[in-house]
Structures are given as structure tokens and as C-alpha cells.
Amino acid sequence: NYGVKRSSGIVVETDSQHYYPQMPYYLLPNIQSDDITTEVKSNYILMPVAQAIQKLDSYRDTITIKSLLTTTEDAYIENDPENSTWSKSADSETGAFDLGVSITETVDDKETQIIYFSSASMLSSQIDQAISGANSKLAATALTSMCDVEQTVVIPSKSTSYTNLVFTQGAVNTWSIITIAGIPLVLVVIGVMIWMKRRKQ
């Protein structure tokens, strides 16, 4: 083994800034600094129905494990997603979980590298299009980093579609409040001010 295991359940995020609207199991993880993630650092990565990657208590000292994608501390593992109400229970395992890791092992000047992402659907066309190709860009960069070449040029296919705007659940909540309460309140205040001005005249 290479020092990691996969959790039995799926990861659910409760921080509204880190999941897709109304889908707390469609995760928008924190992107850690690494050569592999440099190209997508300013983008969102969408990880649907992902499992936590957990480090084993002990593994060979020749192995180095580095986090690439992580949840917030508010995430938890849902062991029964088919019957879930998507709310954290008292016995839920919580914390910041790895969703993507880079594993390297060097033995006798020979290096083994594994890059592991825990969402089987992250490269589906629908998921990738939702974030304007950031997932496929990350995968391409990961493959490039494992190739024994100085430089690999990756030319993405040209798209005639518009770039998608990605909103987190938190952003949706904020704009809902502004639309439902903020704008009408401003209009009422303006109306009162106009009425008072005319009354004085």
C-alpha cells in the first residue's frame, strides 16, 4: 500500500461557500499550493460524491503524502447517503478531509508517483463543463507531472460555449437576501424620501 485508504461513506460539506447550490455532496474544495494545482489555483474544482482519503496510522518512511484538495473543517462523512437528510449528527466523523493527494516514494534513486482524486465523476463532461473545464485541466496537469519529460504542452479543445459562472450556496443565499429584502427596502426608502419632499413643498 501507499499510506492511504478511502473512507466508506461520502464527504458532505456544511460550509456554504464550499459546495454547489443545494448539493452539499457536490464539493468545491480548497486548492492547496503545489506545482500540480498552479494552473487551477484561481478556479473552482468540483468534486461530486467524493470519499475522504485518509492517511494510515503507519506507512513506509520512503513515502511522502501531500494534500492537493481539501474540505473545510466543517465537513463530515455521511455513511448512509441513500437515506440521508444531509444534516450532521452527533456521531458524525468531522474535520478537514483530503479529496486529492499526491503520493511519492523514492527507493534506490527510483521514484514512484501516484496522484489520487476520490471522485469517480469529476471528469464527466457535465461536471467539467459546469466549471469551465477546470477539472480536466487539473487532470491534464497531474498526468504531465507524472511524465518523465521536461515539458508537455496541453492544448485544450476550443469551445464555442460561454464560460460558466460558478456560484456557491453561500453566494446564492447572499444574492437571494439582496433580491428579496435589500432592493425592495431601498425602493421603499426612496419612495418615503420623495413623499416627504413633496409634502414639504
Feature locations, PLM:
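Acidic, S/T/G-rich, low-cysteine, solvent-exposed domains in lumenal/extracellular/periplasmic regions
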Residues: N1-Q151
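Short, aromatic-rich amphipathic segments at membrane interfaces
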Residues: M122, Q129, V154-I177
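Low-complexity, flexible helical/coil segments
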Residues: E150-S157, G191-M193
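C-terminal target-recognition/interaction regions appended to catalytic cores
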Residues: T179-I183
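Alpha-helical transmembrane segments
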Residues: L185-K197
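Short, charged juxtamembrane terminal tails flanking transmembrane helices
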Residues: R199-Q201
